[in-house]
Amino acid sequence: MRILLIGEYSHLHNSLKEGLMQLNHEVILTSSGDSFKNFPSDFLFTPHICNRWFFAKMRNVLLRLFHFDLEELERGIRFYLLTKHFKNFDVVQLINEKPIQTMPVFERFLLKKIFTKNHKVFLLSAGVDKINVDYILKNKNFKSLLQPFFEDSSLKKHYNYVFTYLNKNHQKTHRFLYENCLGIIASDMDYMLPLRGNKKFIGLIPNPVNVDKLMAQDLKINEKIIIFLGINRGNYHQKGIRYFEKALVFIKEKYVDKIEIIIAENLPYQEYIVEYNRCHILLDQVFAYDQGYNALEAMAKGKVVFTGAETEFENHYQLTEKVAINAKPDVCYLIENLSFLIENPADILKMSNNAKAFIQKEHHYVNVASRYIALWEKY
């Protein structure tokens, strides 16, 4: 089968490609590299010109005066120049409703070319989209990245990208995709729950994790327990990082001789991996039902991760033992759980083994790729 994967989000499509290739399928991945993370692709449409001093200044002026983004335009043009390579695929999968991330009119023009020149096209819900945002706004108690905004509307500027999914221009893109794709697949519980009952929703397939590359090792605790917090200022509020920071202030004072804290900010993917390889405990996010990609890779390596692990997640996978700590936007709760682990290192080792076994069973990249093939072939 010839498969085209368009867009990247936290290494998901890269891992899926690796699994599909293990099954002897021909796979092409094209993306912008997912911003500063610089994920690899067969065909990159990363904007470069706008990084130059003159064009960066011009971009800022145009954004401020006319809300026109030169970077989006460049991204679209670069994708257009690559479209000669994107023909006659058996399956195309788009990640999110804006996989190209150009201007809405240009996005639809490019997507129409993809639909007309290929066979089956599916949409993967692995991030914010119109259906997801609509659901969150109607269900404000739903654990989501928008909760900080609901509590403090002054944070709106940090959520502008979320609300672009509700503007009229994007809604046209949403309707086009919704009417023309063969189905919508969810990558985890956070995207499945808003899709329940939707006629286009065809199933949840867990994020693929390339366990062969990660080389999991038995966790060893020698002198100090190492806690890692990675900070990306672009999603600082959405991940609830401030709750972790406040908890760590207390933990650092209480257990000064028992712990080491690593805080890494805005690192490219490869550097981020090197830093967190040293840790026993990884602090990921507090506003989620399920694990995102960073959490899954850490769990595959046997880290104890504070992330989404709500009851809905445990019920879906029929878990009887904890594979991660369900993080909540509650500093006292986080302190309590961190303290318990620091004082009971045997529980760290036990959960480490549970996490590795869970990833092997539910997220192994080849098994997940097989599930995609089976689902695509139904349509």
Q: Where are the language model's segments positioned?
A:
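Acceptor-binding helix/loop patch of EC 2.4 sugar-transfer enzymes
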Residues: 123-166, 234, 310, 315-317
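Short N-terminal targeting/anchoring amphipathic segment
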Residues: 2-6, 82-105, 120-123, 281
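A charged, aromatic-enriched C-terminal amphipathic alpha-helix characteristic of glycosyltransferases
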Residues: 346-377
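A short, active-site helix/loop in glycosyltransferases that binds the activated sugar's phosphate group
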Residues: 132-133, 161-202
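Aromatic "clamp/platform" in nucleotide-sugar-dependent glycosyltransferases that forms part
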Residues: 286-287
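Conserved donor-binding/catalytic core segment of Leloir-type glycosyltransferases
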Residues: 203-239, 245-248
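Short hydrophobic beta-strand element within catalytic cores of glycosyltransferases
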Residues: 304-309
